[in-house]
Design a protein with these regions (language model features):
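Feature of Fe-S/electron-transfer and energy-metabolism proteins
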Residues: 1-127
């Protein structure tokens, strides 16, 4: 089954992301809602196996699924807006579900806390 990731942030919702998500679900896809990549001019933006499509409308779903969409932007991580960034605070943005502890753990979450708990207060301050 095809997994389609679509942002559920406020801007994506205002641009019609819910309707696009419903259209993908109606086409038999598994829809995962997550955080935005921050490319708001491409919302609603759908990601399928790392490939981006946007901005989409519900009527675009069939062409995305059959590979004929003119709204393909290529690999999202290679898009010029994303590729030139060094994401620190937002390293997980667009890659995880914002409220998912499972996604947080799978992408290295808690590692800083584990490291801190293994050190004394003085060692933490010294770092």
């Amino acid at each position: 089954m095809t997994v389609v990731r679509i942002s559920d942030d406020a801007l994506a919702l205002a641009c019609g992301a819910d309707a696009v998500a419903e259209a993908f679900a109606a086409a038999g896809c598994t829809v995962e809602r997550g955080s935005s990549w921050g490319m708001h001019w491409l919302e609603p933006l759908a990601e399928i196996e790392g490939q981006g499509f946007g901005p989409l409308e519900p009527g675009d779903v069939a062409s995305v699924m059959d590979g004929s969409s003119g709204k393909a932007i290529g690999p999202i991580e290679e898009h010029p807006f994303i590729a030139r960034q060094q994401r620190l605070t937002f390293a997980r943005a667009g890659k995880t579900r914002a409220l998912s502890l499972e996604d947080y753990v799978a992408t290295g979450g808690w590692e800083g806390l584990k490291k801190a708990r293994a050190n004394s207060p003085a060692a933490i301050i010294a770092q």
